[in-house]
Amino acid sequence: VDQIDYYFLGGNTMDGIIHDYRYLTGKAQMLPKWAYGYIQSKEQYYTAKELAEIVRHYREIGVPIDCVVQDWNTWEPGNWGEKILDKERYGDNKECMEEINKMHAHSMVSVWPNMNAGGKNHQEFFDAGYLLYDYATYNAFDEKAREMYWKQAKEGLFDEGFESWWCDSTEPFSGPDWNGGVKREPWERYELVGGEHKKYLDPAVANAFALMHAKGIYENQRKDTEDKRVLNLTRSGYASGQKYAAMLWSGDTCASWDNFKIQIVEGLNMGPSGYPYWTLDIGAFFTVADKWQNRGCGCNTDPEPKWFWQGKYNEGVKD
C-alpha cells in the first residue's frame, strides 16, 4: 500500500531545526573556497582558448573572477551528452585550464545524464544495459552505472583539466515542457513533465534521480582524489543532497520583475530544506526570441541591477 511518512523536527531556533535535519540526512560538505566567489557563465563558449581569454580579460580590467563555466556543446557535432571533448575546439583544453589556474581562477563544465546514440559513451552504457528505457538516459539508481558515468567524466573532462561540474537537466525528463507556443499553467506543466517521467521511472523515486546522480559524482570523485573538493552545480535536487556537495540553481529563467520576485522566495525556501548552497542566473537566462516571448519571457533590463545586488549575497555568485 502506498503511504507517506511524515517526520516532525522541533526546535527553539531555525538553526536548531536545521541541525536536527542534517543529523538525519547528512552534513553539508565544504565546497572549494573559490566556489563562494564570482562564477562567470554564458550560453556558450566555443573553445578552450575562449575560456582562458575570458579570465584574462577580467584580470586586465580589474574585475574579480573565480570560475569560468563551459556550458554545453563541448562534444563533437551530433554527439549530445558525450563526455569526450571535440579535439578541434578543445584539443588544448588541459593547457588552457592550467593557464586559467595560473591566473588564480578555476573552471566548471556542463555534463548531462542523457547521450545521443552513436557516441562512444552512449555505446558503453548501452552494451552494459545501464540505460533507462528511453535508451538515452543512464540509470543513476544503479551503482555500477554511476561508476561508469564517473569513469567517462574523469577520463574525458576531469583529466583534461576541468575542476567542477554543472550537472544540467537532472530532472531528467522535462523535454516536453520546452515545446509549445504559449505559456502553460503550473498544473499543466506538472502533468506534462510528470507524465513523461512515469514512462521511464517509478513515480515514487523519480524525484530522487538528481540525488543519485549527485551521489555518483561526489563519491567517485572522492575515491579517485582527495586533492580537490567536489562542486556540483545542479538544476534539481532532493532531500540529503547537501552531503554530496550539491549547489542548486533555480534553472532557466526569464527577465521580469515577477520572475525576480520568485527567485527571492525560492532561495529563502531552499535554506530550511537543508541545502546551504543555492544560486541563480543573475539577470535571467533566456534571450529574446519569439519562441520565449510567447511563453511569458520579456526583454526587461530594469531588474538587472537589483538582481545582481541580490545575487552577490548568494552562496555562489553566478552571472
Residue ranges and their predicted role:
Residues 1-319:
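Catalytic-domain carbohydrate-binding cleft regions of carbohydrate-active enzymes
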